[in-house]
Amino acid sequence: MTQEMENENLSFTQQLRKDGFIKDIDTNPTCFDDTDSQNQLPIIFIPNTILLPHTDITLNLDKQHTDNLLHTVDDNNHGIILTPKKLEEGNGNVEFYDVGVILEIKSLTEDKENELLPEEYVLELKVKDKVYVNKILKKDGFFHAQYKILPEENTLTEDEITELNKNIDETVLEIAKFLPNTDKYTRKILGKLDTQDKLAEVFPFLKVPINKKQELLELDSVKIRALKVIQLLLEQKDAIGIQMELAKKLNKKMNETHKNTLLREQMKLIQEELNMTDDTPAHKTYRERIKDAQLPKEVEEAALEEVTKLERQGQNNAEENIIRNYLDTILQLPWHKEENPTIDIVKAKKQLNDDHYGLKKVKTRIIQHLTVLKMKKDKQGSILLFVGPPGTGKTSLGKSIAAALERPYVRVSLGGVNDESEIRGHRRTYLGALPGRIINGMKKAGKTNPVFVLDEIDKMTESLNGNPTSALLEVLDPEQNDSFSDNYLEVPYDLSDVFFIGTANSLQDIPGPLRDRLEIIELDSYTNTEKHHIADEHLIKEVLLEHGLTEDDLKITYDAIDCLIEKYTRESGVRGLKREIAAIARYVTEKIVVDNVERPYVVDENMLYDILGHEKSHYDKVPDSNPPGVVTGLAWTPIGGDILFIEAVLLPGEEKLKLTGQLGDVMKESAQIAQSLIKSRLATVLKDSDIEKRDIHIHVPAGSIPKDGPSAGVTLLTTIASLVTNTPVDSTLAMTGEISLRGKVLPVGGIKEKVIAAHRSGIKTVLLPEENMKDLDDVPCEVKDDMTFKPMKTVDEVLYEALGLKLPENKPLNISIDEINKVTP
């Protein structure tokens, strides 16, 4: 709108000169000719201007152009305004719109207000009718237009006029709020009562291209034109509003910046008045800090070199911040070796026992490691790696060791790390470079001898950005980590005093070179008895504290804890058990706050369904009896042991073996070995049977769960033997062990977990490989005392104990080489 106002105040000469059309007024457009016709009027050219009928306009012209204009109009002071559409490049031809308006000169006065300017005249003009130009003619050296009047359709009712005028006025007032110095024009628009007059006043202020204004002029209906103008005004109002809002925000931001600058200048003046000004340049401050830090020589030289670079940087230079961050990192790191406190073995034992129940072998190994440290008094030696299922206390053991040694505790999770730079850091040439997690951990510790737990090191993966496990080799190797090189620091850092502890769920995902540098300590699954003690001594107390309760508010009975362990959790650790206890605590908290129940609130086994819902886990129980072809085996899983039923049936066929239940290759091979042993060892027993005309189908239930491993060998053998001899096996008997083709029973792993699972499921007798009998030392006494264990060396012993079969001695054929050669052709 403001630009249109400025254009309105331009003289006609200035307007023509500004838009480059003065020289084109005397040009012969291609459509001109010298034919005379009636209804002709001279043409007045006003570039970049579209006017509506009923428009009043004032022009300031110098004397020459005033004379030209007066010669152009007819005797009635009428002329036709046409607006050039485009200028064809190269030939100077001008193309005009076909529709224009008739202009009438109302008055002409000389402008005498400014005597310093050249002589000018003020012309008052009135736009009359809209016309269609048929031809453009040249007559007496001037251009004329042959035209016809285009009547406008004005069928507006009084109500429509009132409504349209109201909408125009309201929109104009809204726009005027955003723009300064528009009161004069706003009052002029509001003062018009006729819709066409109002449109004529608003039209010059529309911020739309010339061709769009021409389209509005060419509309026949005044009503449609008014509606379109209102729509354009509303769009213009929204656009101006957005611009003003952005300008307001920008202005506010600039004001805040100016305010902050002003306050800083004022502070500087105040400090100068109080002699508080610190004119010490940054590089001098850093030099003093580096000197006071007494860094190692190599590190000090590197830091001073960076300070020298800082001196050359200009103020607010991007490189300056990079150097400052580097120097701050150097100065925040601990460089001087701490004197390690004397290791109190008695205190360490007490700390471990207070924080963790059970884990006897693990605690013994940790204490042995600490005693070596106490005697050696220099490097820590081997790096400990705790391996075990989730929730068995691997990470918390590291925290207990830190407390026992009175050292800082730092934990870094490496799960999901697939970039070597996460360990070694990024080079400072990269934008946003940072040191690696090891150096950041040391900065956090503040000392050179923390207990540093590297959590989930088996969860690291290799990617295009390198292999982080390879970077850990230098960190965890006692022969190398006294000069660990971080890409960000670019100076060696001594990690030899750090007590590194790693944790992992599985050894399979740890590369051999890294595993070779670690002292592996395996943590087994907790037994139900151990879980019960942990819940009593640790979990319930922690949950009560977390929920703002005390032992006087909530009691959980012994049977309820057992039920939680057996029927609501199925895990190797105790995290799930703690979640269930927390759910009980939330329930009781609500009862106390809302219902004001009597305290202590006692939760027994019968209340668990109302609090926790249906049982969430189920353990298989042995049946009263097994049919022939069904035998109970023992299995190891990441969450502990379990019993495993193996089933077999005979089918008509050709002595083929069919296996189902998602069995792995090793387990399939064990079944084939079992079948071969049955054929060789039971040949005498089966000589009268039709076993050779039968297929054997073996299935292991829980078909959705993959199963593999050699420990089901004896169970598969016994299952087939039970089937073909039609002899059932005692349902309270279970077994585990690998078999060889020679009929040997070989040792397997996971004996502790398997035996505990057997006891939980009601098994009374377990057949074990003879070499695994020593592993029963790890089984809790309360479990061993309820069961009978029988050592097995051969499959013959297994079949005798399970089925009562006495097989003949397995003797090799006594045939000499000479006898074989005699019958060989």
Curated annotation (Swiss-Prot):
Identify the SUPFAM superfamilies for this entry.
P-loop containing nucleoside triphosphate hydrolases, PUA domain-like, Ribosomal protein S5 domain 2-like
Instruction: Name the principal localization, coarsely classed.
Output: cytoplasm
Listed Pfam families? AAA (PF00004), Lon_C (PF05362), Lon_lid (PF22667), LON_substr_bdg (PF02190)
Annotated ranges, domain Lon N-terminal = 41-237
Q: What is its EC number?
A: 3.4.21.53
- Is the keyword Glycoprotein in the record? no
Q: Where in the cell is it found?
A: Cytoplasm
Record's protein name: Lon protease
Give the source species.
Methanosphaera stadtmanae (strain ATCC 43021 / DSM 3091 / JCM 11832 / MCB-3)
